Swiss-Prot record:
It comes from Bothrops insularis (Golden lancehead). CDD domains: EFh (cd00051). GO terms for molecular function: calcium ion binding. Belongs to the calmodulin family. Calglandulin subfamily. It is found in: Cytoplasm. Residues 8-43, 44-79, 82-117, 118-153 form the EF-hand domain. It comes from the Eukaryota. Pfam families: EF-hand_7. May be involved in the cellular control mechanism of the secretion of toxins from the gland into the venom. Ca(2+) binds at residues 131, 133, 135, 137, 142. This is Calglandulin.
Length: 156
């Protein structure tokens, strides 16, 4: 699975892994996984962290090796890529004229009528929070932040 990582990412992640390999034996304590992940800019939920720990510590010894960590990072990057593709597709549905942004009225209509509909006040509050630059439209970065609850930088 590490095949989805670039050589630069592999080098970076190996270096970070080695920082946590206190005994120099090629192993890192599963308890250090959260710190390791946050150092690479990933802040998983407690539940996701528990699942990640199970994935890398198959023999339940409380440690994992670099290959396991690289596999985990490969899976993470693959999921991120898939999420990005899904979000781009959703954005295109709303940006029918390919302007690069979603009109306030279009988004408000969707928020009030699709999925778990919001009332008008909730929809407007969500859009105000999402419209970081205050221009009355939602661009792709703002859309992703709104949908994922985090800021997102385009990876191009």
């Amino acid at each position: 699975m590490a095949a989805t990582l670039t050589p630069e990412q592999i080098t970076e992640y190996k270096g970070i892994f080695e920082m946590f390999d206190e005994e120099g034996n090629g192993l890192v304590k599963t308890d250090d996984l959260e710190s390791l992940m946050s150092l690479v800019g990933i802040n998983p939920t407690k539940r996701d962290l528990a699942n990640m720990a199970k994935d890398v510590d198959k023999d339940k010894k409380g440690t994992f090796n670099c290959d396991g960590f690289l596999a985990l990072m490969g899976i993470y990057h693959e999921k991120s890529k898939n999420q990005d593709e899904e979000l781009r597709a959703a954005f295109k549905v709303f940006d029918k004229e390919h302007k690069g942004y979603i009109e306030w009225d279009t988004l408000k209509y969707v928020l009030m009528n699709a999925g778990e509909p919001l009332n008008e006040q909730e929809a407007e509050l969500m859009m105000k929070e999402a419209d970081k630059d205050g221009d009355g439209t939602i661009d792709y970065e703002e859309f992703v932040a709104m949908m994922t609850g985090e800021s997102f930088k385009l990876t191009q």
